[in-house]
A protein has these predicted regions:
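Conserved S-adenosyl-L-methionine
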Residues: 24-28, 95, 245-250
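Conserved acidic E/D residue at the C-terminus of a beta-strand in Rossmann-like folds
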Residues: 33-34, 125, 252-256
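Glycine-rich phosphate-binding loop and adjacent beta-alpha segment
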Residues: 82-158, 206-221, 238
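N-terminal Rossmann-like dinucleotide-binding module
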Residues: 208-268
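Glycine-rich Rossmann-fold phosphate-binding loop(s) that bind the pyrophosphate
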Residues: 10-12, 104, 231-232
Length: 274
């Protein structure tokens, strides 16, 4: 909420995006990370940031910054097996403060940390309400806005609006561009220092194929050619077996996305998929 102090532990891509959003919503934000380049990046965006590796005690810093009150909330976006992160999050929180885990950390919690301050702890479920709900994600059954304000879709819409309005800067977070053939440079070391966001660059002259040739099947001359639009369950379970039984020649199988058509075309022995 407006005026609250929130600590973001871990200033990677998610941490820096979250810190900017919190600041845009009127929160006082403190960032914590051991990578000085990321600390400097946060500072360049007006975020108070500290590096524990440089001798700064983050718990003491938060206490001093808040006048001994503690942080209203702690957002953990770090990735580490250490249990010390959750302990420090409790220590820097005010009484009845909130801790939200977005990253992956060691969770050997101490009961006293939570009991004495009546802290609340929550694990974030990625995109928001609707995640892992088949009715929402696959069937398009939305939640009423009056009862569920922030769903996956509404969260994404808000982020896109924040980017377009300039209140969220993501372009400056791109630290490297790598050719697709060299993708291992990114995925081989996801935690290298200084790396925040990476872009895979596809060849500019690469040919985009909308029709994929499946095989070199030989067909008997004189028979008609059949094209199929739709590669769903009915086509796979009913239509294709009937055509195969009749030794029909399938010239094309088409689907909206192309991938399902390609898979079914290989199974059915069709010539092309699109």
């Amino acid at each position: 909420q407006l005026g609250e102090t929130v600590v973001v532990v871990g200033l990677g891509l998610i941490g820096l995006v979250a810190a900017q959003l919190l600041r845009a919503n009127g929160c006082k934000v403190i960032g914590v990370d051991f990578d000085q380049q990321k600390v400097d990046m946060a500072a360049s965006k007006g975020i108070v940031a500290v590096n524990p590796g440089k001798g700064t005690d983050p718990v003491r810093f938060v206490e001093d910054y808040t006048g001994g009150i503690g942080a209203d909330g702690v957002l953990i976006t770090a990735s580490t097996q250490s249990h010390e992160v959750i302990h420090q999050a409790c220590e820097m929180s005010r009484k009845r403060g909130r801790i939200v885990l977005v990253g992956v950390i060691g969770l050997n919690m101490r009961r006293d940390d939570f009991y004495k301050k009546e802290l609340s702890f929550q694990v974030s479920c990625s995109y928001g309400a609707g995640r892992y709900d088949e009715e929402y994600e696959n069937k398009g059954h939305d939640y009423p806005l009056a009862y569920v304000r922030w769903t996956e879709k509404r969260n994404f819409e808000t982020i896109l609006h924040a980017i377009s309005s300039g209140s969220l800067d993501v372009k400056s977070l791109i630290t490297e561009e790598v050719d697709l053939v060299d993708y291992e440079e990114i995925y081989g070391d996801m935690r290298k220092k200084g790396s925040i966001a990476s872009i895979l660059r596809f060849p500019a002259d690469s040919k985009m194929e909308s029709v994929v040739s499946i095989g070199n099947n030989t067909f008997v001359s004189g028979k008609g050619k059949i094209g199929i639009i739709g590669a769903g369950n009915y086509t796979s379970a009913m239509v294709i077996p009937c055509l195969a039984k009749a030794h029909a020649r399938i010239k094309y199988i088409a689907s909206a996305q192309g991938l399902s058509a390609k898979i079914l075309a290989r199974k059915a022995g069709a010539e092309n998929a699109t």
